[in-house]
Every structure is written in structure tokens, then in C-alpha cells.
């Protein structure tokens, strides 16, 4: 069971974007960082365990020649083995900061040459894999940046092609040196999923066909791909084969966020139907089949939920953002 804990006030509110919450836990400092997008700015907040807000910072898109400031599409902390970077994507480009948002270490402008006059450029979908940061784009390409142990010498390593429509989300999992193991999955507006193996050159392992419904959020855990769709379904696939194992009618409206607690295999799903659900994933050791169990449901009354994340790898707490909601809601297990 979970109960509502002290919420964290926001200066504005959360924009109606999927995956509009990022969480970074700093156990050594007993702090948790939260990141939320609102229009042309991103709010960063630090809070103590009891939810006491300690610091706030606002980040804006790097200014260009446009009349109005470009909108931010996502903010996300990327935890690499040797450093943590905060990545901000927008309609103009990709910005990477030190983890507290104090110093911008890299800027990548989107190339308008790839866009037609009727297409809106944007980057969306952010994840870290080993010493790479991968970012999706409106064209369906995934940009792979090579990140040094320190400093600003970040390099665009390669561009991955596997999607024909805009990227919605990217998820990764540490493969721990296992050869041939799928450790990244990408999703797009048509519902297509691509499963990759990272390395000096990324390799496309499996392509899972869509069914005419967008896939706003995706996660990867121990060879299981969890995908949340615009029709409210959560589908669980085998990452190696692409086979569909389980289909859950989890929500009544489009899913806005999925998250995983990797230590225990808990999956969190949130949707525009005001509900947040927690599921337990498992792979049967004898048959190899994927199993799922519903653990908890929470109704966020009169709220279009747009972001939800576990606040610790054990899945004992989670946070939720909603459109036009001027606070981050927090829940802890009892």
C-alpha cells in the first residue's frame, strides 16, 4: 500500500507532455532532484526525504533568432558510469548540463535541412547507455552522443535509422557486458518499437510492428520490453524475439508515463484517465514466460496525469505530475 506524502510546490505547473517528470536520487546527500517542463522553461527542484523543498532553478532554451521562445519537450537526468548529465530537448536543439543545471556543457542544434516546410522540428526521448547518451528526433532518427568522463568534449557518434515517424521515448538497461543482449528500446508515434544492442556501433536486433496507435512511453527490464500505448494498453514483449507475451487493458485513456524499479521489477503506469498503477513483472524460470501481477492503484482526482516516476530503485516511493497542477505529488509505501 502507498499513502500520500507531503507534496512539493511548483512555481508554475506541468505542461501536457508525456513523460513530464524526471527524478534523480542522491542517497549520499539524502536529496532527490525533480525536473518538470512548463512551456519554454524547465523547473529543477531539490527536496529532502520529507518533501521539504530546498532549492529551485529554472532552465530555458538557448535563444535563437525566433520571435517566440521555443518550447521544451523533455528534461531528463542521464546517469552514466562516471558522471551524471541533465539533458533538455526542445524544438530548437539539445542542451546538456551538469547534473544541478548550473553549467551547460554541450549544445546541439537541430538541422532544419531534414525538415519539410510543414514539419515541426523537435527532439524527444532521452536515455543513457554505457558512455553514450541517445536522443530521439522528429525525423525518427536517434542521435548517439559519446560522453567523455569529464569536460565538454561531447561528440555526435552516429545516427540510428529504424523509425519512419517521430521518436516518443527511449529506454535502456545496463547489459553488464553480456554479448548480444538487448539493452536499448526506442518507440515512435506509430507504435513501432526497435530493440538495439549498444556498443561502438549500435546494432538493431528486433523491430516490433505497431498497430496504428502511438507508443508514448517504453521501459526495458531483464529482457522484457514494457510499452504503454495511446489506447491505454500496456504490452509486454520479449526483447530478444519481439514476441508479445502479455496485453493489459491498464487504462481508459492514453498512457502518459511508464517507469521501472529495477531492483524489484515493479512497473509504474500513469495515464490521462487520472490513474496510476503499479505492477510486478516476473519471468517464470521454468517456462521462460513473462508474468505480471497488479500491486496498487491510485486515483489522482480531476488530474490529467502527464508524468510519474519511482523515487528509488526499490519502488517504495513514487512521484506524479499533472497538467495545470502546481505541485509534485509524492507517495510512499506503508
UniProtKB/Swiss-Prot annotation:
Widely expressed in the ovary and testis (at protein level). It is found in: Vesicle; Cytoplasm; Cell membrane. Pfam families: WDR54 (PF21031). GO terms for cellular component: cytoplasm; motile cilium; plasma membrane; vesicle. GO terms for biological process: fusion of sperm to egg plasma membrane involved in single fertilization; negative regulation of receptor internalization; regulation of epidermal growth factor receptor signaling pathway; regulation of MAPK cascade; single fertilization. InterPro entries: WD40/YVTN_repeat-like_dom_sf, WD40_repeat_dom_sf, WD40_rpt, WDR54_beta_propeller. Keywords: Cell membrane, Cytoplasm, Fertilization, Membrane, Repeat, Ubl conjugation, WD repeat. SUPFAM superfamilies: WD40 repeat-like (SSF50978). The keyword Repeat applies. Cross-linked to tightly form both dimers and trimers by TGM2. Cross-linking enhances the activation of EGF receptor-mediated signaling pathway. Cross-linking is inhibited by EGF. WD6 repeat is required for cross-linking by TGM2. Plays a role in the adhesion and fusion of the sperm-oocyte membrane through its interactions with IZUMO1 and IZUMO1R/JUNO. When cross-linked to form dimers and trimers, it has a regulatory effect on ERK signaling pathway activity in response to EGF stimulation. Colocalizes with the EGF receptor in WDR54-specific vesicle where it sustains the internalization and controls the degradation of the EGF receptor after EGF stimulation. Homodimer and homotrimer; forms tight forms of dimers and trimers. Interacts with IZUMO1 and IZUMO1R/JUNO. This is WD repeat domain 54. The gene is Wdr54.
